[in-house]
């Protein structure tokens, strides 16, 4: 069985994104910095698959310590996952990607951050049971 996981952070009410970025991007509060550090530590040496916007936000240094694959929601997910036999695969998002890959994810690593501001993208709890609540 392929080891497929999701790693993401959400705000207090499930906020995921705002204007194409993390709503808390650039926040230097130690809890936010710790979450970013943890993301890079957990994915190090593994595969990170994500949509183009998510991959575009990954700093250049991160490409040397993990395999990063830009995927599209229309790609066959089973074919994508088969590219990495024996590897741990993290699905990094965004929403269109999670809508497709939710049914393959065996472990959800979700960090709730102390952000309670605005957002235009939200975490869908239906992903936790294998599918999108809304299409």
UniProtKB/Swiss-Prot annotation:
Its top-level enzyme class, in one word, is oxidoreductase
Organism listed in the record: Methylorubrum extorquens (strain ATCC 14718 / DSM 1338 / JCM 2805 / NCIMB 9133 / AM1)
Which reactions fall under this protein's catalytic activity? 5,6,7,8-tetrahydromethanopterin + NAD(+) = 7,8-dihydromethanopterin + NADH + H(+); 5,6,7,8-tetrahydromethanopterin + NADP(+) = 7,8-dihydromethanopterin + NADPH + H(+)
Do you know which SUPFAM superfamilies this protein is assigned to?
Answer: Dihydrofolate reductase-like (SSF53597)
Which Gene3D superfamilies did the record assign?
Dihydrofolate Reductase, subunit A (3.40.430.10)
Identify this protein by name: Dihydromethanopterin reductase
Enzyme Commission (EC) number:
1.5.1.47
Task: Describe, as the record does, how this protein assembles with itself and its partners.
Answer: Homodimer.
**TM segment ranges:** none
Gene this chain is encoded by: dmrA
InterPro entries in alphabetical order: DHFR-like_dom_sf (IPR024072), DHFR_dom (IPR001796)
Q: Does the keyword NADP apply?
A: yes
Any one GO molecular function term? dihydrofolate reductase activity
Q: How does changing the pH alter activity?
A: Optimum pH is 5.3.
Instruction: Identify the metabolic or biological route this protein is part of.
Output: Cofactor biosynthesis; 5,6,7,8-tetrahydromethanopterin biosynthesis
Q: What does this protein do?
A: Catalyzes the reduction of dihydromethanopterin (H(2)MPT) to tetrahydromethanopterin (H(4)MPT). Shows preference for NADPH rather than NADH as electron donor. Does not reduce dihydrofolate.
Q: Where does NADP(+) bind?
A: 9, 16-21, 52-54, 93-97
